[in-house]
Amino acid sequence: MAVLKPVRLGVNVDHVATVRNARGGALPDPVRAAALAKAAGAHGITAHLREDRRHIRDADMERLKAEIDLPLNFEMAATDEMVAIACRVRPNACCLVPERREERTTEGGLDAAGQRAELAPRIARLKAAGIRVSLFIAADPAQIAAAAELGADIVELHTGAWCDAVTEGRHVEAEAEFVRLKAGARQAAGLGLEVHAGHGLDYATAERIAAFPQIVELNIGHFLIGEAIFVGLDQAIARMRAAIAAGRAAVGDGAAA
């Protein structure tokens, strides 16, 4: 078996901005959090500029690109406004996600199969600007196939349903979701897509999914920012990196077969 590269950790700083915006003003600064994440060994920074600007602001995205020497993953809705902003900021990648104003967080995956007409020109415009395109989707065969057909470079598999089932002790459902994720990772890699995963991951679930040999990157935010309240961001990231490394090491032990 070929030696696998370590799984990259992308740190999402959205919820530093959530705390800032709860009171207004400039603090805590999500760009400072991104700098601390880099110092702690993060491989990339993720931030979601929502249409309602509930946490990350336009200026945050511009500063993250200008001040943080790490790949920037710009999460956004597939709208003309967001595509124009992304083409100006020029992040390393854009991850297209579904958005509903009434949701507290991104609740489901993008319907790539059902929104081809809307997605295709926006994906093409981002790629023409030299931006890699990722689609945040469920581990569903039709969605993964659509992502490849649309010309996406990456799929980020939505791990939220699995993580919720694990946390709530719904063991049968958790195992079924895990099997779906494993099959989805295999399908996506087989179609030439780079495979990422994220949403709801903690130390234990990140370790387990890092054992999928197809996984290249995990994007984690809310859990790490919550842990940082108690142990500091550097320690939270260090422990997460160790968990991910342990999961990747399990590939050689046959745990991901």
Curated annotation (Swiss-Prot):
Subunit and partners: Homooctamer; tetramer of dimers.
Q: What task does this protein carry out?
A: Catalyzes the complicated ring closure reaction between the two acyclic compounds 1-deoxy-D-xylulose-5-phosphate (DXP) and 3-amino-2-oxopropyl phosphate (1-amino-acetone-3-phosphate or AAP) to form pyridoxine 5'-phosphate (PNP) and inorganic phosphate.
Gene designation: pdxJ
Name of the featured protein:
Pyridoxine 5'-phosphate synthase
Give the chief site where it resides.
cytoplasm
Catalytic activity line of the entry: 3-amino-2-oxopropyl phosphate + 1-deoxy-D-xylulose 5-phosphate = pyridoxine 5'-phosphate + phosphate + 2 H2O + H(+)
Tell me which Gene Ontology terms the entry assigns under biological process: pyridoxine biosynthetic process
Q: Organism's domain of life?
A: Bacteria
Which residues does the Swiss-Prot or TrEMBL record annotate as the active site? 48 (proton acceptor), 75 (proton acceptor), 199 (proton donor)
Pfam families found in the cross-reference section: PdxJ (PF03740)
Classification lineage:
Bacteria, Pseudomonadati, Pseudomonadota, Alphaproteobacteria, Hyphomicrobiales
> What cellular component GO annotations does this protein have?
cytosol
Pathway(s) served: Cofactor biosynthesis; pyridoxine 5'-phosphate biosynthesis; pyridoxine 5'-phosphate from D-erythrose 4-phosphate: step 5/5
Per UniProt, 3-amino-2-oxopropyl phosphate binds at 12, 23, 200, 221-222
What Gene3D superfamilies is this protein classified in?
A: Aldolase class I
Q: Where in the cell is it found?
A: Cytoplasm
UniProt-annotated binding residues for 1-deoxy-D-xylulose 5-phosphate: 14-15, 50, 55, 105
Q: Which keywords fit this entry according to its UniProt record?
A: Cytoplasm, Pyridoxine biosynthesis, Transferase
Family according to the record: Belongs to the PNP synthase family.
Q: Which residues does the UniProt site feature Transition state stabilizer point to?
A: 156
One Gene Ontology MF term: pyridoxine 5'-phosphate synthase activity
Q: What is its EC number?
A: 2.6.99.2
The UniProt entry, under InterPro entries, shows: Aldolase_TIM, PyrdxlP_synth_PdxJ, Pyridoxine-5'_phos_synth
